[in-house]
A protein has these predicted regions:
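Aspartate-rich (DDxxD/NDxxD/DxxxD) Mg2+/diphosphate-binding motifs
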Residues: 56-75, 105
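Hydrophobic alpha-helical membrane-embedded segments
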Residues: 18-26, 31, 43, 47-53, ...
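C-terminal ends of transmembrane helices
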Residues: 1, 67-69, 133
């Protein structure tokens, strides 16, 4: 996923959430609806989250240095994980607290039509934001389902914005039901129940975000299809006999580390092995452009059935 496509979705969501937060909080001030307060805080939290995603994207573009020789690509994962914490604490826990408080001490809505009007406007704005996120995601989603895309995406911005927008629209529907039932029945308990449901929804979304971004922070390797592509690129030539073992790791959304131990003929000159490794690296980069850091170690392979060591300890030296 390009950074520009993620930024488009983030900026669209940020603009929508700032406007929505203001209208929701105004509606809460005039009506006293706890659902409006919960949704207002939710939108403020989302706005802060989008600013964090933009900040993470900017920091990730810093050049590598001696302290971080592989660069700062994982900054995007760090800020995405912080987003899940904010959504859980500020959005979810606050909504649950406010809902329980309103449940224990319910108050009638003072201007019941205002929350309904605000919710309808908010639904329109959130739909625009979600539409933008879906449009940008479709550029990179390929044939994956939405669940697969969210689980497998290495760039966190679009999955985060998608989940936030879906949660926002779902929260608006819950708030609409809570306020609507309060107006119809005259019982403010429904407003409190709607607020609690919003809190539960936000906590669940935050947990999903936290689990997925934690996996990226710990370190994920290439997908099986990408791993197979790299292996084919390595073996698609006469240079090496086989791959003894290979490991991959995403250093950032667009930067993949490839480390492999390759079997070479023990009789080869060192200069020939070095030239072969250069050729293999070029093939890997052509097949997998995200493979920015490639480390290939030459070795001599022994068949395990021959009861010898898996790899030879002979150092391959050049011969004149």
């Amino acid at each position: 996923m390009s950074a520009s496509s993620g930024n488009k979705a983030i900026i669209a969501a940020l603009g929508a959430n700032l406007g929505i937060a203001a209208t929701k909080l105004i509606a809460w001030a005039f009506s006293g609806s706890s659902s409006m307060l919960a949704e207002g805080v939710h939108s403020l939290a989302d706005s802060g989250n989008q600013l964090l995603l933009l900040l993470g994207g900017r920091k990730s573009r810093k050049d590598a240095d001696t302290e971080h020789p592989f660069g700062y690509g994982r900054e995007r994962y760090v800020y995405a994980f912080v987003v899940s914490i904010i959504l859980f604490s500020i959005g979810g826990v606050f909504s649950l607290y406010e809902g329980v408080q309103k449940l224990q001490d319910p108050h009638p809505l003072e201007v019941p039509w205002l929350p309904i009007l605000v919710l309808l406007v908010a639904m329109a704005l959130e739909s625009f934001s979600l539409r933008t996120a879906i449009k940008e995601s479709n550029h990179t989603r390929g044939g994956e389902t939405w669940v697969q895309f969210i689980r497998h995406a290495k760039a966190p911005e679009l999955p985060v914005v998608l989940l936030e927008d879906v949660a926002a629209l779902s929260g608006l529907v819950l708030a609409f039901l809570g306020v609507g039932l309060t107006i119809v029945t005259g019982d403010p308990i429904w407003d409190a129940i709607g607020t609690i449901c919003i809190g539960v929804l936000l906590v669940l979304v935050a947990i999903v975000l936290g689990v997925e971004t934690k996996s990226l922070l710990v370190g994920e390797g290439a997908r099986p299809a990408d791993t197979a592509t790299i292996q084919r690129a390595i073996l698609n030539g006469p240079e090496t006999q086989r791959i003894i073992h290979m490991k991959t790791l995403y250093l950032g959304p667009d930067e993949l580390l490839v480390a492999a131990k390759l079997a070479f003929d023990a009789e080869l000159r060192f200069s020939d092995v070095a030239a072969s490794i250069d050729v293999i690296e070029e093939r890997v980069r052509a097949a997998m452009p995200s493979a920015r850091a490639i480390y290939l170690e030459p070795d001599v392979f022994h068949d395990p059935s021959q009861h010898g060591p898996l790899t030879d300890t002979i150092i391959i030296r050049g011969r004149e």
